[in-house]
Amino acid sequence: MKPILLIHGGAWAMPDDAIAAHERGIAAALAVGWKQLESGGTAVDAVEAAVTVMEDDDTFDAGRGSFLTRDGRVQLDALLMNGADLKTGGVACVERLRNPIQAARLVLEKSPHVYFVGSGAERFATQHGMRLIDNTELIVPRERERLMAFQRNEAAGQPDTTFSGADVAVIAQSTLPEEFRIDDPTLHSHDTVGAVAIDQFGNLAAGTSTGGTLSKAPGRVGDSSLIGCGCYADNLSAAVSLTGWGEPIMKLVLGKWAVDRVAAGATPQEAATDAIAYLFDRLGGHGGMILMGPDGSLGIAHNTPRMAWGIATAEGRELGITRN
């Protein structure tokens, strides 16, 4: 089987001046993840490696540089799933781990359980060699400013255009007092990262990592780390990672919805396109999806203005910011 790696850096209303940073981040993650596959590593190795790079890049809403909770802290969620045997590891609401995808790998390999939350997840990770950090190490000044701006605008009735785009915001901001307007395009929101891969053995894997939504309530868990919602992998169907507004994705169990359609005969592209249409038609949701079939066929879809994505194969690399 020819190995393939497919990753995303979040589906959202990405401003023009954020494109270059996303392209650099996607390229770096592809390089590291592909090195795992090229050297004979597993799909799980490649997914973990690629997601780790994006967690360490504060361009993305995962790991350091993530959105802040309502009370100004970072809380992280991640899931990793092996399609060969359905072994899965997930963590949520962790505040003192730099790389939650690595903690998810430990849960997958070292625990009879599937999912750990909060201090229990952190305790498990330290018992298996991970180092705890102070939450402030995950916070960047940009996100403090973003949180304050968001909360000011929320109080003034400014609509949240994280996923749908800025057209509504342009109109709405013109009606706001000047001190409440957001003129810096870097203060628009961004989202979750993820990866899917197939290795030389024909095994699939998927992983998703996120800092969640901006100004979320402390303790809120989104779709990213929930099996079948923001992430799923099964050699008998497909591997998927999602990004976007988590609550509608959870209600639809959208990741499993998509892989089931591949199992029923749809191509990954058909299933991804249909899933994102279903997300909007049923619940008005916005987001994106990467999907990989057991034969290495790919699907990429989003209904947000942009979604950063990248593909690595033995033939080369392909990157994009839109795919419709």
Indicate where each model-derived feature is located.
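Alpha/propeptide regions of enzymes that mature by internal proteolysis
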Residues: M1-N324
